[in-house]
Amino acid sequence: MSEENGRTDLTWRELLDEGGARLSEAGVPDAGTDAWYLMEAAFGIDRVHYYLDQNRPIHAERLEKGYGRYQEMLQKRAERIPLQQILGMQDFMGMTFSVDENVLIPRQDTETLVERVLRDYPEKDLKLLDMCTGSGCIAISLAVLGGYQNVTAVDISEAALRVAK
């Protein structure tokens, strides 16, 4: 039984619907999608198991372990903390990068910059400098995907550099 919600028969579907409703009431865009990602992170459930078990009661021990975390994550999202910061990660150029409140969240439009460098500068001996690297997504993507030999990432923020490492 989950002490927080007082129920022992809560299903995955009900849990997701409640999370989506809570975020929707807070005016969060894409509330259902965000509730899914938060539930996935809090409980470690994947889509296959969700669809197979969505109408079955969640095992009490699993509910007890994840419910509080899920509620905390929903509250943060309702307060408009970005989903990526709550989850601590963002995909960029096919890789997953750590993010928190100390760095900007990598965006798809920045991927165009990386793609352009990869396309227009095939020479691997270039010296590349990523100023204000934040999460390090640009520098790391160029080094990994482009095979550039000399990529330097710098930031004035020690907190940002810890994220980039």
Language-model regions, residue ranges each:
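Conserved acidic
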Residues: 11, 62, 156
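A general structural signal for well-ordered alpha-helical segments in protein cores
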Residues: 16, 35, 70, 80-83, ...
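Conserved AdoMet
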Residues: 40-119
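Conserved SAM/SAH cofactor-binding pocket of Class I
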Residues: 108-165
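A short N-terminal interaction module
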Residues: 2, 6-57, 70
